[in-house]
Curated annotation (Swiss-Prot):
Chain span(s) of sequence motif 'KMSKS' region: 247-251
Organism: Methanopyrus kandleri (strain AV19 / DSM 6324 / JCM 9639 / NBRC 100938)
Organism taxonomic ancestry: Archaea, Methanobacteriati, Methanobacteriota, Methanomada group, Methanopyri
Stated name of the protein: Tryptophan--tRNA ligase
GO-annotated biological processes: tryptophanyl-tRNA aminoacylation
Cellular component, GO annotation: cytoplasm
GO molecular-function terms, A-Z: ATP binding; tryptophan-tRNA ligase activity
Length: 374
Protein backbone atom coordinates (compact mmCIF):
# COMPACT_ATOMS: atom_id res chain seq x y z
CA UNK A 1 0.00 0.00 0.00
CA UNK A 2 1.19 3.54 -0.81
CA UNK A 3 0.39 6.34 1.64
CA UNK A 4 -0.03 9.64 -0.28
CA UNK A 5 0.50 11.65 2.92
CA UNK A 6 3.58 9.92 4.34
CA UNK A 7 6.11 8.35 1.99
CA UNK A 8 9.89 8.25 2.42
CA UNK A 9 11.36 5.73 -0.02
CA UNK A 10 9.84 4.09 -3.07
CA UNK A 11 10.58 0.83 -4.87
CA UNK A 12 9.69 1.98 -8.39
CA UNK A 13 10.16 -1.42 -9.98
CA UNK A 14 7.83 -3.09 -7.47
CA UNK A 15 5.18 -0.43 -7.96
CA UNK A 16 5.34 -0.82 -11.72
CA UNK A 17 4.83 -4.57 -11.43
CA UNK A 18 2.33 -4.60 -8.55
CA UNK A 19 0.03 -1.77 -9.60
CA UNK A 20 0.31 -1.95 -13.37
CA UNK A 21 2.05 1.36 -14.00
CA UNK A 22 3.40 1.13 -17.54
CA UNK A 23 6.91 2.32 -18.47
CA UNK A 24 7.27 5.32 -20.78
CA UNK A 25 9.17 3.88 -23.72
CA UNK A 26 10.40 5.38 -26.97
CA UNK A 27 7.15 4.47 -28.73
CA UNK A 28 5.25 6.69 -26.28
CA UNK A 29 7.84 9.49 -26.38
CA UNK A 30 7.54 9.63 -30.18
CA UNK A 31 3.91 10.74 -29.79
CA UNK A 32 5.06 14.04 -28.25
CA UNK A 33 5.33 17.02 -30.63
CA UNK A 34 8.86 17.64 -29.35
CA UNK A 35 11.35 15.98 -27.03
CA UNK A 36 10.76 16.45 -23.31
CA UNK A 37 13.95 16.09 -21.23
CA UNK A 38 12.13 14.96 -18.06
CA UNK A 39 10.92 11.92 -20.00
CA UNK A 40 14.16 11.34 -21.90
CA UNK A 41 16.16 11.31 -18.64
CA UNK A 42 13.80 8.85 -16.96
CA UNK A 43 12.57 11.32 -14.33
CA UNK A 44 9.00 10.87 -15.56
CA UNK A 45 9.15 7.09 -15.75
CA UNK A 46 5.66 5.58 -15.86
CA UNK A 47 2.08 6.20 -16.92
CA UNK A 48 -1.51 5.13 -17.26
CA UNK A 49 -3.09 5.94 -20.66
CA UNK A 50 -0.52 8.65 -21.46
CA UNK A 51 -0.34 7.26 -24.98
CA UNK A 52 -4.13 7.67 -25.30
CA UNK A 53 -3.86 11.27 -24.08
CA UNK A 54 -1.16 12.04 -26.66
CA UNK A 55 -3.10 10.33 -29.45
CA UNK A 56 -6.19 12.39 -28.58
CA UNK A 57 -4.04 15.52 -28.64
CA UNK A 58 -2.49 14.61 -32.00
CA UNK A 59 -5.98 13.93 -33.41
CA UNK A 60 -7.04 17.46 -32.48
CA UNK A 61 -9.38 16.35 -29.69
CA UNK A 62 -9.90 18.40 -26.54
CA UNK A 63 -7.52 17.45 -23.72
CA UNK A 64 -6.47 19.17 -20.50
CA UNK A 65 -3.87 18.79 -17.75
CA UNK A 66 -4.46 18.97 -14.00
CA UNK A 67 -2.09 18.76 -11.04
CA UNK A 68 -2.74 20.24 -7.62
CA UNK A 69 -0.70 21.86 -4.90
CA UNK A 70 -0.76 21.14 -1.17
CA UNK A 71 -0.21 24.52 0.55
CA UNK A 72 1.34 23.27 3.76
CA UNK A 73 4.97 24.40 3.53
CA UNK A 74 7.69 26.06 1.50
CA UNK A 75 8.11 25.19 -2.17
CA UNK A 76 11.30 23.28 -3.03
CA UNK A 77 13.00 21.81 -6.09
CA UNK A 78 10.97 18.61 -5.79
CA UNK A 79 7.80 20.65 -6.35
CA UNK A 80 9.43 22.37 -9.32
CA UNK A 81 9.44 19.03 -11.16
CA UNK A 82 5.62 19.19 -11.35
CA UNK A 83 5.59 22.83 -12.49
CA UNK A 84 8.11 22.09 -15.23
CA UNK A 85 5.64 19.54 -16.61
CA UNK A 86 2.67 21.91 -16.44
CA UNK A 87 4.67 24.61 -18.22
CA UNK A 88 5.68 22.15 -20.95
CA UNK A 89 2.11 21.11 -21.72
CA UNK A 90 0.83 24.68 -21.60
CA UNK A 91 3.63 26.43 -23.49
CA UNK A 92 4.77 23.70 -25.91
CA UNK A 93 1.43 21.98 -26.59
CA UNK A 94 -1.05 24.79 -25.83
CA UNK A 95 -3.07 22.58 -23.46
CA UNK A 96 -5.22 24.18 -20.76
CA UNK A 97 -3.96 23.57 -17.22
CA UNK A 98 -6.03 23.23 -14.04
CA UNK A 99 -4.33 23.84 -10.69
CA UNK A 100 -6.45 22.90 -7.67
CA UNK A 101 -5.25 24.23 -4.33
CA UNK A 102 -5.89 21.44 -1.84
CA UNK A 103 -6.71 23.69 1.11
CA UNK A 104 -9.35 21.33 2.50
CA UNK A 105 -6.93 18.42 2.36
CA UNK A 106 -4.22 20.53 4.03
CA UNK A 107 -6.70 21.45 6.75
CA UNK A 108 -7.91 17.91 7.48
CA UNK A 109 -4.76 15.87 6.77
CA UNK A 110 -2.10 18.35 7.96
CA UNK A 111 -4.11 20.37 10.52
CA UNK A 112 -3.41 23.55 8.54
CA UNK A 113 -5.46 26.67 9.30
CA UNK A 114 -7.35 27.64 6.12
CA UNK A 115 -6.29 31.30 6.17
CA UNK A 116 -2.68 30.21 6.61
CA UNK A 117 -3.04 27.69 3.78
CA UNK A 118 -4.40 30.41 1.47
CA UNK A 119 -1.49 32.73 2.27
CA UNK A 120 1.06 29.97 1.64
CA UNK A 121 -0.70 29.08 -1.62
CA UNK A 122 -0.29 32.63 -2.91
CA UNK A 123 3.12 33.56 -1.50
CA UNK A 124 4.93 30.24 -1.98
CA UNK A 125 3.14 28.43 -4.77
CA UNK A 126 1.16 30.63 -7.16
CA UNK A 127 3.91 33.26 -7.21
CA UNK A 128 6.57 30.64 -7.95
CA UNK A 129 4.39 28.87 -10.53
CA UNK A 130 4.13 32.16 -12.43
CA UNK A 131 7.84 32.90 -12.00
CA UNK A 132 8.67 29.44 -13.37
CA UNK A 133 6.77 30.22 -16.56
CA UNK A 134 3.14 29.15 -16.07
CA UNK A 135 0.82 31.60 -17.83
CA UNK A 136 -2.00 32.50 -15.40
CA UNK A 137 -4.30 33.80 -18.14
CA UNK A 138 -7.67 32.21 -17.19
CA UNK A 139 -8.15 31.00 -20.77
CA UNK A 140 -4.98 28.91 -20.42
CA UNK A 141 -4.96 28.09 -16.72
CA UNK A 142 -7.56 27.78 -13.95
CA UNK A 143 -6.40 28.11 -10.35
CA UNK A 144 -8.96 27.43 -7.64
CA UNK A 145 -9.43 26.54 -3.99
CA UNK A 146 -11.16 23.26 -3.19
CA UNK A 147 -13.12 25.16 -0.53
CA UNK A 148 -14.48 27.64 -3.11
CA UNK A 149 -15.19 25.65 -6.29
CA UNK A 150 -18.85 24.62 -6.05
CA UNK A 151 -18.61 22.27 -9.06
CA UNK A 152 -15.96 20.22 -7.25
CA UNK A 153 -17.88 20.18 -3.96
CA UNK A 154 -21.13 19.08 -5.63
CA UNK A 155 -19.37 16.41 -7.66
CA UNK A 156 -17.53 15.09 -4.58
CA UNK A 157 -20.80 14.64 -2.71
CA UNK A 158 -22.33 12.78 -5.64
CA UNK A 159 -19.24 10.63 -6.27
CA UNK A 160 -19.16 9.59 -2.61
CA UNK A 161 -22.14 7.36 -3.34
CA UNK A 162 -19.92 5.30 -5.66
CA UNK A 163 -17.56 4.29 -2.85
CA UNK A 164 -17.86 2.17 0.27
CA UNK A 165 -15.98 2.82 3.50
CA UNK A 166 -14.20 -0.51 3.07
CA UNK A 167 -12.86 0.54 -0.35
CA UNK A 168 -11.50 3.83 0.95
CA UNK A 169 -10.16 2.28 4.16
CA UNK A 170 -8.35 -0.51 2.34
CA UNK A 171 -6.93 1.82 -0.32
CA UNK A 172 -5.45 4.31 2.13
CA UNK A 173 -5.04 2.40 5.38
CA UNK A 174 -7.47 4.61 7.27
CA UNK A 175 -8.39 3.52 10.80
CA UNK A 176 -11.01 4.35 13.38
CA UNK A 177 -8.81 7.28 14.43
CA UNK A 178 -8.89 8.94 10.97
CA UNK A 179 -11.00 12.09 10.96
CA UNK A 180 -13.82 12.13 8.40
CA UNK A 181 -12.45 15.22 6.65
CA UNK A 182 -9.22 13.34 5.93
CA UNK A 183 -11.17 10.27 4.83
CA UNK A 184 -13.24 12.42 2.44
CA UNK A 185 -10.14 14.09 0.91
CA UNK A 186 -9.60 11.36 -1.75
CA UNK A 187 -13.17 11.85 -2.98
CA UNK A 188 -12.58 15.60 -3.30
CA UNK A 189 -9.41 14.83 -5.26
CA UNK A 190 -11.40 12.55 -7.56
CA UNK A 191 -13.81 15.44 -8.13
CA UNK A 192 -10.87 17.75 -8.85
CA UNK A 193 -9.63 15.36 -11.53
CA UNK A 194 -13.02 14.67 -13.12
CA UNK A 195 -14.65 18.10 -12.94
CA UNK A 196 -13.00 19.50 -16.12
CA UNK A 197 -15.28 17.06 -17.96
CA UNK A 198 -18.25 18.61 -16.17
CA UNK A 199 -17.15 22.05 -17.36
CA UNK A 200 -15.95 21.37 -20.90
CA UNK A 201 -17.55 18.06 -21.79
CA UNK A 202 -16.05 14.55 -21.94
CA UNK A 203 -12.32 14.58 -22.66
CA UNK A 204 -9.12 13.02 -21.39
CA UNK A 205 -7.43 14.80 -18.49
CA UNK A 206 -3.73 14.15 -17.83
CA UNK A 207 -2.58 14.21 -14.21
CA UNK A 208 1.23 14.45 -13.78
CA UNK A 209 2.09 13.46 -10.20
CA UNK A 210 4.59 11.77 -7.95
CA UNK A 211 4.06 8.03 -7.67
CA UNK A 212 2.78 8.43 -4.09
CA UNK A 213 -0.42 9.88 -5.59
CA UNK A 214 -1.23 6.74 -7.58
CA UNK A 215 -3.89 5.54 -5.08
CA UNK A 216 -5.89 8.68 -5.93
CA UNK A 217 -5.60 7.94 -9.65
CA UNK A 218 -6.63 4.30 -9.29
CA UNK A 219 -9.65 5.30 -7.22
CA UNK A 220 -10.60 8.08 -9.65
CA UNK A 221 -10.31 5.81 -12.68
CA UNK A 222 -12.65 3.30 -11.03
CA UNK A 223 -15.16 6.07 -10.28
CA UNK A 224 -14.91 7.48 -13.81
CA UNK A 225 -15.80 4.09 -15.26
CA UNK A 226 -18.88 3.87 -13.04
CA UNK A 227 -19.91 7.41 -14.04
CA UNK A 228 -19.38 6.79 -17.79
CA UNK A 229 -16.68 9.47 -17.85
CA UNK A 230 -13.36 9.21 -19.66
CA UNK A 231 -10.73 7.78 -17.34
CA UNK A 232 -7.96 10.25 -16.51
CA UNK A 233 -4.47 9.60 -17.82
CA UNK A 234 -1.51 9.98 -15.49
CA UNK A 235 2.26 10.18 -15.54
CA UNK A 236 4.53 9.45 -12.59
CA UNK A 237 7.82 11.08 -11.76
CA UNK A 238 10.56 9.94 -9.43
CA UNK A 239 11.00 11.80 -6.16
CA UNK A 240 14.03 13.97 -5.72
CA UNK A 241 16.32 12.54 -3.09
CA UNK A 242 16.75 14.78 -0.07
CA UNK A 243 20.16 16.39 0.37
CA UNK A 244 20.84 14.05 3.29
CA UNK A 245 19.16 10.99 1.72
CA UNK A 246 15.50 9.94 1.82
CA UNK A 247 12.80 12.15 0.30
CA UNK A 248 13.17 15.91 -0.12
CA UNK A 249 10.66 17.46 2.29
CA UNK A 250 9.45 20.94 3.24
CA UNK A 251 9.19 19.81 6.86
CA UNK A 252 12.91 18.92 6.94
CA UNK A 253 14.77 22.08 5.83
CA UNK A 254 18.18 20.42 5.66
CA UNK A 255 16.90 17.97 3.03
CA UNK A 256 15.66 20.58 0.56
CA UNK A 257 16.69 23.45 -1.68
CA UNK A 258 13.80 25.89 -1.35
CA UNK A 259 12.93 28.18 -4.24
CA UNK A 260 13.27 31.15 -1.88
CA UNK A 261 16.67 30.10 -0.50
CA UNK A 262 19.32 32.74 -1.04
CA UNK A 263 22.20 31.63 -3.28
CA UNK A 264 24.75 31.31 -0.47
CA UNK A 265 22.41 29.13 1.60
CA UNK A 266 21.84 26.90 -1.43
CA UNK A 267 25.58 26.59 -2.03
CA UNK A 268 26.17 25.63 1.60
CA UNK A 269 23.43 22.98 1.44
CA UNK A 270 24.95 21.52 -1.73
CA UNK A 271 28.41 21.47 -0.15
CA UNK A 272 27.03 19.39 2.75
CA UNK A 273 24.92 17.10 0.55
CA UNK A 274 25.25 13.32 0.38
CA UNK A 275 27.35 12.11 -2.56
CA UNK A 276 28.26 8.83 -4.18
CA UNK A 277 31.97 9.45 -3.81
CA UNK A 278 34.56 7.26 -2.15
CA UNK A 279 35.16 7.43 1.60
CA UNK A 280 38.51 9.14 0.97
CA UNK A 281 39.99 11.04 -1.95
CA UNK A 282 42.50 8.24 -2.49
CA UNK A 283 39.76 5.61 -2.53
CA UNK A 284 37.66 7.71 -4.90
CA UNK A 285 40.57 8.18 -7.31
CA UNK A 286 41.30 4.45 -7.26
CA UNK A 287 37.81 2.94 -7.38
CA UNK A 288 35.64 5.81 -8.64
CA UNK A 289 32.26 6.93 -7.33
CA UNK A 290 28.63 5.99 -7.87
CA UNK A 291 26.59 8.80 -9.49
CA UNK A 292 23.40 6.75 -9.02
CA UNK A 293 23.70 7.33 -5.27
CA UNK A 294 24.79 10.98 -5.52
CA UNK A 295 22.34 13.76 -4.66
CA UNK A 296 24.60 16.33 -6.34
CA UNK A 297 24.53 14.46 -9.65
CA UNK A 298 20.76 14.05 -9.31
CA UNK A 299 20.39 17.84 -9.01
CA UNK A 300 22.17 18.13 -12.36
CA UNK A 301 19.86 15.58 -14.00
CA UNK A 302 16.62 17.08 -12.69
CA UNK A 303 17.25 20.80 -12.92
CA UNK A 304 20.69 21.84 -14.12
CA UNK A 305 21.57 19.90 -17.28
CA UNK A 306 20.95 22.86 -19.59
CA UNK A 307 23.11 25.06 -17.34
CA UNK A 308 26.12 22.78 -17.40
CA UNK A 309 26.21 21.68 -21.03
CA UNK A 310 23.24 19.36 -21.63
CA UNK A 311 22.94 15.59 -21.75
CA UNK A 312 26.38 15.12 -23.31
CA UNK A 313 27.95 16.88 -20.32
CA UNK A 314 25.89 14.73 -17.94
CA UNK A 315 27.23 11.58 -19.60
CA UNK A 316 30.78 12.94 -19.37
CA UNK A 317 30.44 13.73 -15.65
CA UNK A 318 28.88 10.33 -15.00
CA UNK A 319 31.77 8.56 -16.74
CA UNK A 320 34.42 10.64 -14.98
CA UNK A 321 32.80 10.00 -11.60
CA UNK A 322 32.79 6.24 -12.12
CA UNK A 323 36.44 6.33 -13.20
CA UNK A 324 37.53 8.63 -10.36
CA UNK A 325 38.56 11.40 -12.77
CA UNK A 326 36.33 14.02 -11.16
CA UNK A 327 35.98 14.55 -7.43
CA UNK A 328 32.94 15.50 -5.38
CA UNK A 329 34.19 18.99 -4.59
CA UNK A 330 34.35 19.86 -8.29
CA UNK A 331 30.76 18.73 -8.85
CA UNK A 332 29.54 20.55 -5.74
CA UNK A 333 31.11 23.82 -6.88
CA UNK A 334 29.61 23.42 -10.36
CA UNK A 335 26.14 22.63 -9.00
CA UNK A 336 26.31 25.37 -6.36
CA UNK A 337 27.11 28.03 -8.96
CA UNK A 338 24.40 26.82 -11.37
CA UNK A 339 21.81 26.70 -8.59
CA UNK A 340 22.77 30.19 -7.44
CA UNK A 341 22.13 31.50 -10.96
CA UNK A 342 18.71 29.84 -11.10
CA UNK A 343 17.66 31.14 -7.68
CA UNK A 344 18.79 34.68 -8.53
CA UNK A 345 16.85 34.61 -11.80
CA UNK A 346 13.81 33.18 -10.06
CA UNK A 347 13.88 35.95 -7.46
CA UNK A 348 13.97 38.55 -10.23
CA UNK A 349 11.01 36.91 -11.99
CA UNK A 350 9.05 36.77 -8.73
CA UNK A 351 9.55 40.49 -8.31
CA UNK A 352 8.48 41.08 -11.92
CA UNK A 353 5.22 39.19 -11.47
CA UNK A 354 4.46 40.23 -7.87
CA UNK A 355 2.70 43.48 -8.79
CA UNK A 356 0.63 41.74 -11.47
CA UNK A 357 -0.50 38.85 -9.28
CA UNK A 358 -3.49 40.55 -7.56
CA UNK A 359 -5.02 41.41 -10.93
CA UNK A 360 -4.24 37.98 -12.38
CA UNK A 361 -5.79 36.10 -9.45
CA UNK A 362 -8.86 38.35 -9.49
CA UNK A 363 -9.65 36.81 -12.89
CA UNK A 364 -9.89 33.37 -11.24
CA UNK A 365 -13.17 33.52 -9.27
CA UNK A 366 -12.37 30.56 -6.99
CA UNK A 367 -8.72 31.45 -6.34
CA UNK A 368 -7.39 32.77 -3.02
CA UNK A 369 -7.14 36.51 -2.57
CA UNK A 370 -3.73 38.12 -2.35
CA UNK A 371 -3.07 39.05 1.32
CA UNK A 372 -3.71 42.70 2.22
CA UNK A 373 -0.12 43.12 3.45
CA UNK A 374 1.21 41.88 0.09
Amino acid sequence: MIDPWDVEEVDYERLTEEFGIRPIDEKVRELLPRRFPLLDRGIVFGHRDYDSFLKDYNDGKLVSVLSGMMPSGRMHLGHKTVVDQLVFYQQEMDVKVYVPIADLEAHHARNMDLDRAHRIAVEEYVLNYAALGLDLDPDRCEIYLQSERKTVQRMALLLAGRLTWNTVKNTYGFTGETNMGHAFAPIVQAADILHPQEIEGPHRVLVPVGVDQDPHLRLTRDIAEKEDLIKPASTYHRFMTGLTGGKMSSSKPNTAIFLTDDPETAKEKVWNAKTGGGATLEEHREHGGNPDECVVYELMVYHLADRIGGDEKLREIRKKCREGDIICGECKRMVGEALAEILEELERRREDVRDELPDLLSQHPDAPEVPEDW
